[in-house]
Amino acid sequence: MLPLRRSLLKPLQDVLRHSHRQMSQKNLLELTDRGFFHGIFPDTAAPRMKQLFTRGQQSIYAGFDPTADSLHVGNLLVIMGLIHCQRAGHRPIALVGGATGLIGDPSGRKTERNQLGETVIETNLKAIEQQLRRVFENHENCLWDSKKQKLPLAPLIIVNNADWYADLQLIDFVANMGRHFRMGSMLSRSSVQSRLESEDGMSFTEFTYQIFQAYDWLHLLRRHNCCFQMGGSDQTGNLMTGHELISRVERKREVFGLTLPLVTTEEGDKFGKSAGNAVWLDGNKTSPFALYQFFLRMPDSEVEKLLKLFTFIPLPQVEQLMREHTKEPEKRKAQTLLAEDVTLLVHGESGLKQAERVTNALYKGNVEGLAELNLSEIQQTFQGATMVNLLTEPGMSILELAMKAKCFPTETDAVRIINAGGFYVNQKRVQNIAEVLTTGVHILRNGISLLRVGKRNFYIVRWQ
């Protein structure tokens, strides 16, 4: 598929889009230049890793526990890592933790996770698998040109660790595998130490998590010849435990860990659902418009780093884009391309078009653009807005509309706030309480009116 054409960034964008299609080198460690890797394990293994990456196809896996029914932006960086592996000619494996999700990873957490039931886990698993497949498909369809590449993309492999734990017997597992783990090493992990020093301590359930993640790697090594594991920097301890297990059980095999930086806000807060500020990859939880706006609003101090992490634009073109951006920062060229590429990857061409359509309607005073949105798009955009069904009545005034939609507790409040300029219909301020509603201005041709009181209180009126 040819890339979408967007006039805002022409002619620079033509160069950038064409550059997206160039095949990466097979040595994944070159991504270090993008700030993509936080570290490698063992830390002296770079020469050997380079040799393996350039010698032939390798298998690299990353894990995703089904602790929610959607992945979030923090997970997206790990997905980007797997796609980079795919682009470099290697084989990506996504492990979904149908078993480990029941235990809960203590890494990076101050308290124990709430236990999830098997039914919830199963529902979350299906949703996450669909998201992973959709993101990989969007990349192949929208950001990759197979005709210009020497090698085809290796298909994504998704495995569920519940499949190999289902038939394991507890006593056999402890007897055969438990002897290869050393308590001193396990207790020394930072994720364990921080919890042991806390008031609530750490449960045995959470303590065993690193054992199961280590065994996952051993299983994938044996089944898929998977010598590489990738994860956030908070996974370093778990990667080390897996490396130690394999070095004892499969002494002739070499395995390596790749850790990625944790994505944080400008204030240093983690982008994760536990932090309460999650940006989800599910369009029903975070709409394509909201995802687009999230990246569009990134400060200048962050945008270059995020372009390197969340897009496939080669570094010379990132530098060129930043030079253009520095000359005219008010045009937000860098943020716009970042928002476009991430939205395209997560939601595909239709999601990006929707995000751009809503952006034009809301922020460029385009009433016609607002009229092109359907009810679902408006509801996704204004999540939490009050929904009201009203009958059209000839001669209805602005004041009557506001009261029927229950925008104000009293008519006195309505008159005061409307006269003061605090009431909007379809993103246009209205101050005449006697103004009569007209089709095309107040009532859009899609049969909807968007009301707003102040900056954030939205009401969606669906006319009958």
Curated annotation (Swiss-Prot):
SUPFAM superfamilies, per database record: Alpha-L RNA-binding motif, Nucleotidylyl transferase
Ligand binding (ATP): 65, 273
Residues the entry annotates as binding L-tyrosine: 61, 105, 209, 213, 216, 235
GO biological process: mitochondrial tyrosyl-tRNA aminoacylation; tRNA aminoacylation; tyrosyl-tRNA aminoacylation
GO cellular component: cytosol; mitochondrial matrix; mitochondrion
UniProt short sequence motif 'KMSKS' region, positions renumbered to this chain: 270-274
Reactions performed catalytically: tRNA(Tyr) + L-tyrosine + ATP = L-tyrosyl-tRNA(Tyr) + AMP + diphosphate + H(+)
GO MF term set: ATP binding; RNA binding; tyrosine-tRNA ligase activity
Class of the enzyme per the UniProt entry, highest EC level: ligase
Keyword set includes Ion transport: no
Keywords, alphabetical: Aminoacyl-tRNA synthetase, ATP-binding, Ligase, Mitochondrion, Nucleotide-binding, Protein biosynthesis, Transit peptide
Function: Catalyzes the attachment of tyrosine to tRNA(Tyr) in a two-step reaction: tyrosine is first activated by ATP to form Tyr-AMP and then transferred to the acceptor end of tRNA(Tyr).
Known partners and oligomeric status: Homodimer.
Protein name: Tyrosine--tRNA ligase, mitochondrial
Species the sequence originates in: Drosophila melanogaster (Fruit fly)
